[in-house]
Amino acid sequence: MKAILTSLLIFIATLFISQATFAQERTTDRVWASPNASVAQTIGLTEIYLTYGRPSVNEREIFGGLVPFGEVWRTGANEATAIVFSDDVLIEGELVPEGTYSLYTIPGQNEWTIIINNKLSWGTQYDEAEDFLRVTVQSKESFHMEQMMIYFENVTDQDGHLVIHWDTTRVPVHIQLAD
């Protein structure tokens, strides 16, 4: 019980810290064209929380057009996508300690590089030196998703897939509990 309470307190503190960081960086109270969204998922006793902007297709060519292949993308709109882990996890088999990170990607035609970056920022100041982890995953063709969405699927008490889905591309990323 004590371990659960400690993890919960760390998670809540991390959320407040990350929200305070974003609040300090925002310089306007205007409504964004791409609305902000968040998703939270529990895997076992581990909480995973993301905040991101949801851009729309709006009849544009997305991957290979608006979002070029082979270039770092902040994985959303408005600001960098933030991801918080209440406990250590494995992303595609690689250890990521509990904490708050930025999620960047490098889209490709058939595979994407998933980047876990130590620095929380607006998203335009990406610093490769702050990368904690880079893994490669396969992208899949899927049904059309007008607004970008990040969600979880195939969740068990040990693992699940974080999915980045926009236009007709979906990118599943395996996340499992660390021992």
Task: Specify the residue positions occupied by each region the protein language model found.
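A cross-taxa feature marking solvent-exposed loop/turn segments within ectodomains of secreted
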Residues: 16, 96, 107-109, 143, ...
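Mid-length scaffold segments of soluble, non-membrane domains
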Residues: 73-122
